[in-house]
Amino acid sequence: QDLEINESDPKKLANIICALEPTFGAVNLEDIKAPDCFEVEKICRSKMNIPVFHDDQHGTAIVVCAAAKNALLVASKQFDDIKIVSTGGGAAGIACLNMLVKLGVKKKNIWLCDINGLVYEGRTTDMNAEKAAFAQKTDLRSLDEVIENADMFLGLSGPNILTSSMIKKMGAKPIIFALANPSPEVMPDIARKAASDAIIATGRSDFPNQVNNVCLLYTSPSPRDRISSR
């Protein structure tokens, strides 16, 4: 069942969802912007006795981490050794990074960039607690600077952000997940030309190696019980 709720305040939205608990066997939160989605999920999980799933976060993270595990096997690398550069500090991006940490990636090896550049200690522009958890203590500020020797690029941001020159700075057998839709951070042919040994995935079904929460969503519990904020 798809239920639309006309409420933009995260606390009020969460309380409405919690009040609906007797109606559903599980809840899938949909299209709630960051950072509000983190608060809504936290409140719902603390108060409800049924599963609470946010596919923008958890669906994407599960598929990304499964794909990353396979990519690392191909590249002969390990989670605890790799440097990851990620673009996009929204719900999907943060959830992916949190799950990658649980799989063994060291936080000190994760470099998060958003529209304002690198997330670093002391930055005040467009920050929240979820981004701050990945803030780096460094003088570097740009994607172009931090991409050097990266083992993996994780893009959940926008089109044409990753350039050929950046890819050439990455490590051997770079893993490039350019997952922005409909236009990825770099097109696969451009990435391949810049690094012939690259392991490349996008969020699109018309390119090889699709990494998208659609690969998981309809196998998750109670896919009919969806709640969206509008």
Language-model regions: role of each:
Residues 180-207, 211:
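Rossmann-fold NAD(P)-binding glycine/threonine-rich loop
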